A protein has these predicted regions:
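Proteins with a high burden of low-complexity, intrinsically disordered sequence enriched in S/T/G/P/A and R
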Residues: 2, 63, 107-108
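Short, electropositive alpha-helical surface patch
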Residues: 92-108
Length: 108
């Protein structure tokens, strides 16, 4: 997926697939499920059960920006489903974004 793509699931239900840029990998995707409360599936860009892991295909300098994009997709009231661990809120994603920026020496 390059950019964003809307997937029609039928029955009037659609989801948005979004390439949020490199971070955990070179091609991180998120899925936004619109609803009364937005739900964003984050993959391993967000990890609740421990510190996010950066493997050899990670792009640390861009990871915080990918999390900013996740927050833009879902908004302040969304629920974020991480690749590992329990569902989190926007405050958790922001805190993880700031921790990764500090860890990898990335400024705003």
């Amino acid at each position: 997926v390059c950019g964003e793509w809307t997937l029609d699931l039928g029955g009037g239900r659609q989801v948005l697939l979004a390439n949020v840029g490199p971070g955990h990998t070179g091609h991180d995707l998120a899925v936004l499920v619109p609803g009364e409360v937005e739900v964003v599936f984050c993959g391993d860009l967000v990890e609740e059960s421990g510190e996010p892991q950066a493997g050899p295909d990670a792009v640390p300098a861009h990871w915080p920006a990918a999390l900013d994009r996740l927050l833009e997709l879902g908004g302040a009231d969304a629920r974020y489903v991480p690749g590992h661990g329990a569902v989190v809120d926007a405050a958790f994603v922001r805190a993880q974004r700031d921790a990764l920026a500090a860890r990898f020496g990335v400024s705003r």
